[in-house]
C-alpha cells in the first residue's frame, strides 16, 4: 500500500472555489489560498442565520495506545462514506500542532485512503492560525512585562503622569501569563525573565505549547468576532499586590491581541480524498486543554450540510467529556450521535496483561480482558444520553474470528450498533455500513445531558468529574489547589465548568493503570483560571503544559526530496 504522503500527492483535487460553491458558500465568503484551501468569512453565519440545522456527530475513542486507534481516519472515512451514500456531510477537525508532528504522534490529517488533502499543507502551518495565536499570546506576555518594568522604574505618580494610564501595581509573583511556542521544548517549562541590566524586575515564568494557550481555547469557543474580543478582554494576566485581577482589558492590550487574530477566527476549508468538505479550525489539545475544534466551524457546517462529523481528542474521558461539559455547554449545539473508535490492538494493549505475544497475534485472554475498557467507554458516552455506534478500525493483521467476537460482545452492551471500518485501506467504500448505522443512530432522539450543573461548587464539579467521569473513589486537593478554589470562588468564578488536565493514557491519573482502574484518588495539584475561555483547568498529577521531544522524534523522518517535495510526514 502507498504511504499517506504518496496517496495525498497523487490525489485528484477539486478546486477549493468549486468545493466551496458545492458546499453552499458564495464567492465573497471565501478568501482563497491557492486552489487547495480557503478561509471562510463569518458573514456566512449572518446570511444563514435562519437556516435549519444538520445533525452533529461526535467521534471519540477508547483509551489511546501507541498503536494508534484511527479516530481521525474514522472521522474522515465516515465523512467520505456519507457523501458516497448521497448524504451532504462535512468534517470539522482541529488544526494540527507542529509539536506532535515533529514529536511522537505525527500528523493529524487521517491516513491511508481516509485523509484531508493536501496533508502536508494541513500538518505544516496551514493558513497560519497557530502562529497568529502564538503572536497574540506573546504580545500579552510582553505587555505585562513592559508594564511591570515601567511601573517599577517610575513609581505610581510619575508613571501615571507620563503614561496617562492607571497604575496597576502588578505583583511579579502573581504574573500568570506565560509565553507560548508551537514546538515541544521541555527546557522552557520553567524560566526566569527580566535578567540583565535594565531588563527587570526578574520573575519566574515559563513557556507552554501554543495548543495549551487560553487564546487557543478562546478561538475554539467563541461564537463570533465580537465574542472573541470580549473573551480576550477577560483574560487574567496577573494579580495586583492587593490580590485583584489584572485583565488584558485593564492592561489595554486586548484590542491589539484581537487584531492579530482577526483572520484566525475564520475556519479553513479543505477537502477529503473523495472531495467531501472539511473545515479545520483551532487546535487545543485534549489532555491539557479542552480538545475540540471550533464552535464557529460547527455552526457554519450545521447550516450548510445534513451531517457534521467532529471529533474530541484522545479517549471519551478526555475530549468527549470536554466536548459535552465545556463545548456543548457554551454552544448549545447538541450532538445527535457518537461514534466510538476501537481496534483489536487497543483492547489487547488496554488489557493490563503483560505478554510476550506480538500485539498482532490472536490472543483471546488479552482481548477479553481489554474489552472492559471499551465497555467502560460505551457506558461513559451513553451516560450523556447520546446513542453510540462502535467503529472497529480494521488493521490488516486482524482476524475474522476476533473481529466477530468483538462485534458479538459489543452487541450485548448499551451501544446502538457496531460496524467494522476499512476506511484506511478502502476509503469511502470501506465505511458504508458505518455510515448507514450512524445515520440511523442520529435519527433516534438524543437525550443529551450534562454531567453537572453550572451552580455546583468548584469542588463538587471536580469530585463529580473524578467519581462519575472516571470512576474514582474521590479527589485529593493540594494546599495550593484548596487555596485556589477559595480564591476563584471569592472572585466570582465558581460557576465556570472544569477542564481536567490529566494523562490521556489511562482513565485514571496514572498512565500505568490500564483497563478500568478502580479505587483510585485523583490528585489535583493546582487550578488555573481561564476567565476568557470560560473554564477552570485542574492540573492532575504530573501533566505538563509544555511537552518534550522523545528519544526518536518524528522530525528525524521528515525531509525534502530532489524535486523539493516534503517527505516523511504521516
From Swiss-Prot:
Keywords associated with the record: ATP-binding, Ligase, Nucleotide-binding, One-carbon metabolism
Record keyword Transmembrane helix present: no
Pfam family, one: FTHFS
Sequence similarity: Belongs to the formate--tetrahydrofolate ligase family.
EC number assigned by the record: 6.3.4.3
Molecular functions per Gene Ontology: ATP binding; formate-tetrahydrofolate ligase activity
Source taxon at top rank: Bacteria
Reaction it catalyzes: (6S)-5,6,7,8-tetrahydrofolate + formate + ATP = (6R)-10-formyltetrahydrofolate + ADP + phosphate
Classification via HAMAP family: FTHFS (MF_01543)
Designated name of the protein: Formate--tetrahydrofolate ligase
Species assigned in the record: Shewanella sp. (strain W3-18-1)
Example of a GO biological process term: tetrahydrofolate interconversion
Binding, ATP: 65-72
Pathway this chain belongs to: One-carbon metabolism; tetrahydrofolate interconversion
InterPro entries documented for this protein: Formate_THF_ligase (IPR000559), Formate_THF_ligase_CS (IPR020628), P-loop_NTPase (IPR027417)
